[in-house]
């Protein structure tokens, strides 16, 4: 019963979830760039997680919902979307993910600070 309730709540919340770009503009479902590479952080900015997805709203909500309590993001409370890039091609998104994963921490922080200096959570519930 608990699992069914969790899935239902996640589904309802996802319908109302929105991702915003750095300028505060809603990144709607009409977006023609379906793939994204993204960076999540925890509240204290001590942990970074880099991922790739074909549905940024859904994927960030999955991280925030902590559906899998054994996942890296759930264990370290990494649930703040602090940076993302959109791509036309899944190959380009994966290539960027791999590139960012090889960067040192300083470079990643500089990238985030250039676009989101306050490290605001770019994901918002409507």
Q: At which residue positions do the language-model features occur?
A:
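GIY-YIG nuclease catalytic motif and its immediate N-terminal context
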Residues: 1-68, 74-84, 94-98, 115-117, ...
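Short, surface-exposed polybasic/aromatic micro-patch for ligand or macromolecular engagement
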Residues: 87
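C2H2-type zinc-finger recognition helix
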Residues: 90
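An amphipathic, aromatic/His-enriched active-site/gating alpha helix that lines ligand/cofactor pockets
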Residues: 95-113
């Amino acid at each position: 019963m608990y699992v069914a309730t969790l899935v239902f709540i996640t589904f309802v919340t996802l319908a109302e979830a929105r991702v915003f770009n750095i300028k505060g503009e809603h990144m709607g479902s009409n977006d023609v760039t379906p793939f994204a590479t993204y960076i999540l952080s925890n509240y204290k900015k001590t942990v970074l997680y880099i991922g790739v997805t074909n549905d940024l709203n859904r994927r960030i909500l999955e991280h925030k919902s902590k559906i899998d309590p054994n996942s890296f993001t759930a264990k370290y409370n990494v649930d703040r979307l602090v940076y993302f890039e959109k791509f036309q091609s899944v190959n380009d998104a994966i290539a960027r993910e791999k590139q960012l994963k090889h960067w040192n921490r300083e470079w990643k922080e500089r990238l985030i600070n250039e676009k989101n200096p306050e490290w605001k959570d770019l994901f918002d519930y409507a």
